[in-house]
Amino acid sequence: MAFPYVRDNRLEITCGEAPYIVSRYDTTTGAAIPIEQRIGILDRKLRIVSENTETSGEWLEWAQEAYKSTYAYEWQGDNLLIARETMLVTFIEYYQQKFGKRPLLKSINYIAYIISWNVWQMDGLKGVVPNSCGERRTLVYELFGTKEDVSQCEGCAKDDIRRHNGTYCLIKDWRAKDPKTGKMGKRIRFIDLIK
């Protein structure tokens, strides 16, 4: 199958419940949207996969490619959970529509694994896990006692995304080999993608 769009990397920033990735329901009314009328980024990719594959194995291979190239981040954990759940249910719905049955649990679990790497919680202005950076306190032991040394986050003070002392978010580049494991799916810091 030669459909480069399925493998094109796409990112939804501050994704909320990910309505631009998957459009399972109308966000204003809550009404379900039939699969044929869905217009999200991943919906379009899965529609292309469904229209151009015959076997379950071929469909799963290309659906995995579609998920591996679709990314999103969100600051709020509750929205992140809904976004991930919506993407997972979308996988099941498209598979059921194509083959008339649910996918195997191992297939569902693998898509969930991909989603867990590709849809993550992040403060988009800092590139770190929300609320993970700030002042750091360390005890300094001296000859006549101890004192507390307080240092501020340099990234916050200088508005420099590369100098935060918080936990930087990791994602996977599914097409690059991880030097530690030798397997495809290299772990990278999201901010390292920013030029």
Which residues make up each language-model segment?
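Conserved proline-anchored active-site loop of SAM-dependent methyltransferases
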Residues: V6-D26, T70-I82, V119-V128, S132-W174, ...
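Intrinsic-disorder/low-complexity loop/linker signature
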Residues: G30, D43-L46, G134, G166, ...
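A Trp-anchored, charged/polar loop motif used as the substrate-binding/catalytic surface
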Residues: M1, E54, D173-K195
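Conserved S-adenosyl-L-methionine
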Residues: M1-G127
